[in-house]
């Protein structure tokens, strides 16, 4: 990430510390293995065999369940120690948790369909692991923040993932979120990655080849929204062959226009039409976002369709002073 983050007043160097969560350098395998071996030692376990993989997704086939005779597996005992550590400390800041755990690690985790079991995030545990704590156990976790990607401790073996080759973000209020309009927002050395549009995880086609046909076949409304935003409404309307039925000034948003289009029959929806409007509130960059609403096919006038979306009649909507 090139932009700086808002510092947390409790930890003067939190911005520099959180940079580890977005580091794209190769893992420091020696440091990571030493720290993990020391954590195993705290559990009374010998150093594990280390298996390095090139992405979290590549870890899945390498993971094996703990032996049936193990009443308390290594990962469960480690989780108990982590819970005790975290009881004494809060996350570094709400922004740190939102940016690192929810906006980045959360989207990467959601992109892996298989169950991962207990695991830790290495560099992306930076949201709760403090720098320079002076606590010997926490310092081992801090070493992992500085040294590697995600990791999975198991009986006698530990699977560790390399860090990504790229992590692309954009500001989102006081935090950051994944976004890339040209390729994966997160990409790992084996080519596996995660595509994201303004913080929403999307299939690769949304970023790399959005088309009206793919948008119309997509069931997920958020994916459709992102794809249309990326393609652009003008291109979508042209590709989809939508016919403009009516247009009218938007009384709830002076200076803007409502447009009502006829929609062709679609598999997932009852007969409907598309109302194209402009958001009444201003985006962070000062622009107003165009958006589309699917409305019942019974409406022939955009004011009636817009009023329906607010639970109003067209006549009532026409008397609005300003909407948001």
Tell where the protein language model's regions lie, with residue ranges.
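Short, glycine-biased loop/turn motifs at secondary-structure junctions and
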Residues: 1-324
């Amino acid at each position: 990430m090139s932009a700086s983050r808002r510092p947390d007043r409790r930890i003067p160097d939190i911005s520099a510390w959180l940079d580890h969560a977005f580091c794209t350098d190769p893992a420091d395998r020696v440091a990571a293995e030493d720290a993990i071996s020391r954590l195993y030692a705290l559990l009374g376990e010998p150093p594990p065999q280390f298996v390095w993989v090139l992405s979290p997704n590549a870890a899945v086939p390498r993971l094996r369940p703990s032996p049936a005779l193990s009443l308390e597996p290594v990962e469960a005992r480690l989780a108990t120690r982590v819970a005790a550590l975290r009881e004494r400390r809060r996350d570094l800041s709400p922004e740190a948790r939102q940016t690192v755990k929810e906006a980045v690690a959360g989207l990467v985790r959601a992109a892996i369909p298989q169950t991962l079991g207990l695991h830790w995030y290495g560099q992306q545990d930076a949201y709760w692991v403090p720098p320079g704590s002076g606590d010997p156990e926490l310092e081992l976790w801090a070493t992992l923040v500085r040294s590697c990607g995600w990791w999975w401790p198991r009986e006698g073996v530990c699977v560790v993932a390399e860090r990504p080759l790229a992590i692309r973000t954009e500001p989102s209020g006081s935090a950051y979120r994944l976004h890339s309009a040209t390729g994966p927002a997160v990409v790992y050395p084996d080519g596996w990655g995660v595509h994201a549009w303004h913080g929403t995880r999307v299939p690769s086609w949304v970023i790399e080849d959005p088309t009206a046909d793919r948008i119309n076949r997509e069931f997920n409304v958020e994916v459709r929204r992102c794809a249309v935003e990326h393609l652009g409404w003008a291109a979508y309307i042209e590709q989809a062959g939508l016919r403009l039925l009516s247009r009218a000034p938007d009384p709830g948003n002076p200076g803007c226009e409502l447009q009502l289009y006829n929609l062709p029959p679609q598999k997932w929806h009852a007969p409907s039409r598309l109302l194209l409007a402009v958001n009444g509130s201003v985006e962070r960059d000062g622009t107003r976002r165009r958006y589309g609403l699917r409305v019942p096919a019974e409406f022939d006038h955009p004011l009636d369709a817009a009023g329906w979306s607010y639970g109003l009649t067209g006549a009532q909507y026409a008397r609005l002073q300003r909407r948001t």
